[in-house]
């Protein structure tokens, strides 16, 4: 916030319009696709990577065995996806927009995480209003304690 830099996520500052699109896509739980050996992807509720051996990767492509290149690491349960959305969203200084959560999961995060939010609010680590759940200045300094509630 000095010299025109904006504190837009827990560990980054930028000039307006120069925020990391990659990081923000991760914090917003957007899907991404990785191409090539050792590349990672996230689609719907599945995280996977491609095999790391470049020669094996190329051989599978040449033989038309593309599925042999993919390794599934995790298929998330909905409750895990909801918790992750909170954890990642709280990395952003703007926090989690309640209506965005409702649109994605058709649930109210204030009700769904009422116990966690009450505890964190009582400890002055988060602020909750009608539109947003976000870290307080104290919560920014102690963010790991906040995120632990959603792991």
Segments (PLM) and residue ranges:
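Short secondary-structure boundary/hinge segments and terminal tails
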Residues: 16-18, 120, 137-138
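C-terminal scaffold of the Radical SAM
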Residues: 1-107
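Short, amphipathic alpha-helical interaction segments positioned at domain boundaries
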Residues: 138-151
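Minor-groove-contacting beta-hairpin "wing" of winged helix-turn-helix DNA-binding domains
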Residues: 132-136
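A short, conserved structural fragment
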Residues: 121-131
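Short secondary-structure transition/capping segments
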Residues: 19-23, 123-124, 141
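Short amphipathic alpha-helical interaction segments
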Residues: 106-121
